[in-house]
From Swiss-Prot:
Protein family according to the UniProt entry: Belongs to the HMBS family.
Note: The porphobilinogen subunits are added to the dipyrromethane group.
GO molecular function, one term: hydroxymethylbilane synthase activity
Pathway(s) where this gene product acts: Porphyrin-containing compound metabolism; protoporphyrin-IX biosynthesis; coproporphyrinogen-III from 5-aminolevulinate: step 2/4
Protein name: Porphobilinogen deaminase
Annotated Gene Ontology cellular component terms: cytoplasm
Catalytic activity: 4 porphobilinogen + H2O = hydroxymethylbilane + 4 NH4(+)
Organism: Burkholderia cenocepacia (strain ATCC BAA-245 / DSM 16553 / LMG 16656 / NCTC 13227 / J2315 / CF5610)
Pfam family for this entry, one: Porphobil_deam
Highest taxon of the lineage: Bacteria
Task of the protein: Tetrapolymerization of the monopyrrole PBG into the hydroxymethylbilane pre-uroporphyrinogen in several discrete steps.
PTM annotation (S-(dipyrrolylmethanemethyl)cysteine): residues: 255
Length: 334
């Protein structure tokens, strides 16, 4: 079973006695796990909720970009192993780091209310991207942001930026970069909002699918855990994220492709934007659709409509060329 959508589990007469949350050990990941832990403790005061901190391959490989070492799955495989062997009952993820298709045997049991999905401009010396002088070095961890920067600010130098949030800020503070681009949600969750000099407009820099949202993953057969997590699920966030992830999934989205998808509710309708770029930012394709979304099927249909429009503009040519180039580079590194 491979499910993107939480199923309505049976009502549990008996609350859980213990629950173990698998989490990466970075400060942001632990904040997210503690946020879920605290919510579960309020729901089930007698439950002993523990956190199992784990180091993933994605945390260990810091000298190469994710697109060159295996993509988003590097942040979740160890946590999924803990779910599979029973060491943990649930795993908490930043949804933008979760692969678009989960492995068989796993499911997203809940998607929590979203934080700010925007990208943040962080700098000690400059107020905005527009204020940066020619040749200024900007650090980013994603091809999506890199493509945006190369398209809109070709006079800037864009360099990779790896590591957890604190490591990235430390690299900025020691002068490795004039500015860095980070997800606003992580900064806000850790009380670092003062580090944000500007928030990037979603039209100029559409975020990654699921950015700002937390997803709770379980082993697919754990109907009991799904039912206990049901009160944490936010339906409006989930429908928006389902539409976004459908765009990325339909186009084979991964860390190797500069792909953005962002959905927002306006006047009862869901407005969805998808964008695919070449890594040099010279070709940028954008598609937008909106509609009344009441069910997951509606959300998936909206996502499919946006991906179809992008395909009609030639998005698959971009995706296939990038994937072929990545595979060729991988063979050369072996």
């Amino acid at each position: 079973m491979n499910s993107e959508t939480p199923a309505a589990g049976p009502q549990q007469a008996q609350p859980p006695a213990t629950l173990t949350i698998a989490s990466r050990e970075s400060r942001l990941a632990m904040w997210q796990a503690e946020h879920v832990r605290d919510a579960l403790r309020k729901l089930y005061p007698a439950c002993d909720v523990k956190i199992l901190g784990m180091t993933t391959r994605g945390d260990q490989i810091l000298d190469r970009t994710l697109s060159k070492v295996g993509g988003k799955g590097l942040f979740v495989k160890e946590l999924e192993a803990a779910l599979a062997d029973g060491r943990a009952d649930l795993a908490v993820h930043s949804l933008k780091d979760v692969p678009m298709a989960l492995p068989d045997g796993f499911a997203l049991a809940a998607i929590m209310e979203r934080e700010d999905p925007r990208d943040a401009f962080v700098s000690n010396d400059y107020a905005s991207l527009d204020a940066l002088p020619a040749g200024a070095v900007v650090g980013t961890s994603s091809l999506r942001r890199e493509a945006m920067l190369r398209s809109r600010y070709p006079h800037l130098e864009v360099l990779p930026l790896r590591g957890n949030l604190d490591t990235r800020l430390a690299k900025l503070d020691r002068g490795d970069y004039a500015a860095i681009i980070l997800a606003a949600a992580g900064l806000k969750r850790l009380g670092l909002e003062a580090r944000i000099r500007a928030l990037l407009d979603v039209e100029a820099s559409p975020p990654a699918a699921g950015q700002g949202a937390l997803g709770i993953e379980i082993a697919a057969h754990r109907d009991d855990v799904a039912a206990w997590l049901a009160p944490l699920h936010d339906p409006r966030t989930a429908l928006a994220v389902e539409a976004e992830r459908m765009v990325s999934r339909a186009l084979g989205g991964s860390c190797e492709v500069p792909l953005a998808a962002h959905a927002v509710w306006r006047a009862g309708e869901l407005y969805l934007t998808g964008r695919v770029s070449t890594t040099d930012g010279k070709r940028v394709l954008t598609a937008e659709e909106c509609g009344a979304v009441m069910t997951v099927a509606d959300a998936l249909a909206l996502g499919r409509a946006v991906s179809d429009e992008l395909e009609a503009q030639g998005a698959l040519d971009i995706v296939q060329a990038l994937l072929a180039g990545s595979q060729a580079a991988g063979k050369g590194d072996a």
